[in-house]
From Swiss-Prot:
Localization terms from the record: Mitochondrion inner membrane
GO cellular component annotations of the record: mitochondrial inner membrane; respiratory chain complex IV
Protein name: Cytochrome c oxidase subunit 1
Catalytic activity: 4 Fe(II)-[cytochrome c] + O2 + 8 H(+)(in) = 4 Fe(III)-[cytochrome c] + 2 H2O + 4 H(+)(out)
Residues reported in the UniProt entry to bind Mg(2+): H368, D369
Length: 513
């Protein structure tokens, strides 16, 4: 029964597949929006109308990519598929809640799209700062619809987080300790804890904004004793952990991919990797105000947030060097997934380096809200999170589908994407250092060259996305079945064959420690 299987599903594999399909679809929408942005900025002068329309596109691009592409694919897709298989659990702890978590996302997405359709759209940027997001500068229902959309996506993530935490803690075989679970399982659990602690703060902030807009409260209005800076604190207390939520599952996937294709039976420094992720998770909560260096904070406050932010580089460095140590002395197989992982390690490190630059409050005063910041977070997202997703996808595709991708196409796809994203985002560092501000649809002629280069790069990335669609079609059309998977004793998820049966681990697994 199609309806029973796909709409009322309680199977972690089916729900994971739904998440992957939804995320892929949302990714197409987000990519289309990003190309609209780059088309507008390809040359000076106006292309798509006024700055309001431009900012609606920018805002939608951010929300779609974060809440409907990266999070559903990484946590919902890979998390649902792999976590139960990796710990030998029959399913997630709360299978029906798992289904609800997924089905909250399409309505949420619908509300976000609706916000662009009514009035002038929500041209607030993804941060939704008042007073721009207030009912004076944004009259009409657009921002309210965006807020409701975020509420639904937030509830979905909170329920998913509860589910993953419960599953990882309670559904392991009796003999398996927490320190014997694979790193991807750890990364998803830590991500879930971050979601559980940060999302309620966002919910509070946007609910206060909702009442400010509609019920005459003045939480963020100085005229009634409120303060717009309060909103920024609430938002970024969520917003900073959020960026670690987006990258941590990627860390977990990269650990698995690097270990597997180095022919190793375990990653280098397992405990160090776990503690590094826990440290990143903890530190992620105490650095939020580095997004607010320009609002006039006390010098001591700025000194603290600068130092605390730089300390995050230490556990991150532990992870990077542990990946390199895992590669060391290995029998390296240059598969497409390994190329994505190596690309991730290099480009994520470059993104982290520009992050260290921006952590300096004095430098950030100059660079805040310029394209330098855009370049920084797109290096860690577009070449961190997305490369991890791509690597994870080509690595686990045979597990999900039972078919193999064409190796040559996959390598060509990687090469095109690698050139495209670097050509898009590297020039943005130069634009930022020259003072080009973010969120403007037009710019002085002096910035033309690097903007043109950046826009050409974005179209190269588009061809890579189209090639990936072809590649997936080719795999399903050719139906090359999986012959053999190596290293299954240390990669539990492959144990049941490709694809695994509908129900796995129906009896508790016997784990010999």
């Amino acid at each position: 029964m199609f309806i029973n299987r796909w709409f009322y599903s309680t199977n972690h594999k089916d729900i994971g597949t739904l998440y992957l399909l939804f995320g892929a679809w949302a990714g197409m929408v987000g990519t289309a929006l990003s190309l609209l942005i780059r088309a507008e900025l390809g040359q000076p002068g106006s292309l798509l109308g006024d700055d309001q329309i431009y900012n609606v596109v920018v805002t939608a691009h951010a929300f779609v990519m974060i809440f409907f592409m990266v999070m559903p694919i990484m946590i919902g897709g890979f998390g649902n598929w792999l976590v139960p298989l990796m710990i030998g659990a029959p399913d997630m702890a709360f299978p029906r809640m798992n289904n609800m978590s997924f089905w909250l996302l399409p309505p949420s997405f619908l509300l976000l799209l609706a916000s662009s359709m009514v009035e002038a759209g929500a041209g607030t940027g993804w941060t939704v700062y008042p007073p721009l997001a207030g009912n004076l500068a944004h009259a009409g229902a657009s921002v309210d619809l965006t807020i409701f959309s975020l509420h639904l996506a937030g509830v979905s993530s909170i329920l998913g987080a509860i589910n993953f935490i419960t599953t990882v803690i309670n559904m392991k075989p009796p003999a398996m300790s927490q320190y014997q679970t694979p790193l991807f399982v750890w990364s998803v659990m830590i991500t879930a804890v971050l979601l559980l602690l940060s999302l309620p703060v966002l919910a509070a902030g946007i609910t206060m904004l909702l009442t400010d807009r509609n019920l005459n409260t003045t939480f963020f209005d100085p005229a009634g004793g409120g303060d717009p800076i309060l909103y920024q604190h609430l938002f970024w207390f969520f917003g900073h952990p959020e960026v670690y939520i987006l990258i941590l599952p990627g860390f977990g996937m990269i650990s698995h991919i690097v270990t597997y294709y180095s022919g190793k039976k375990e990653p280098f420094g397992y405990m160090g990797m776990v503690w590094a992720m826990m440290s990143i998770g903890f530190l992620g909560f105490i650095v939020w105000a580095h997004h607010m260096f320009t609002v006039g904070m006390d010098v001591d406050t700025r000194a603290y947030f600068t130092s605390a932010t730089m300390i995050i580089a230490i556990p991150t460095g532990v992870k990077v060097f542990s990946w390199l140590a895992t590669l060391h002395g290995g029998n390296i197989k240059w598969s497409p997934a390994m190329l994505w992982a190596l690309g991730f390690i290099f480009l994520f490190t470059v993104g982290g380096l520009t992050g260290i630059v921006l952590a300096n409050s004095s430098l950030d005063i100059v660079l805040h809200d310029t394209y330098y910041v855009v370049a920084h977070f797109h290096y860690v997202l577009s070449m961190g999170a997305v490369f991890a997703i791509m690597g994870g996808f080509v690595h686990w595709f045979p597990l999900f589908s039972g078919y193999t991708l064409d190796n040559t196409w996959a390598k060509i796809h990687f090469s095109i994407m690698f050139v495209g994203v670097n050509m898009t985002f590297f020039p943005q560092h130069f634009l930022g250092l020259s003072g080009m501000p973010r969120r403007y649809s037009d710019y002085p002629d002096a910035y033309t060259m690097w903007n043109t280069v950046s826009s050409i790069g974005s179209f190269i990335s588009l061809t890579a996305v189209m090639l990936m669609i072809f590649m997936i079609w080719e795999a399903f059309a050719s139906k090359r079945e999986v012959l053999m998977v190596e290293l299954t004793p240390t990669n539990l998820e492959w144990l049941h064959g490709c694809p695994p049966p509908y129900h796995t681990f129906e009896e508790p697994a016997y784990v010999k420690v």
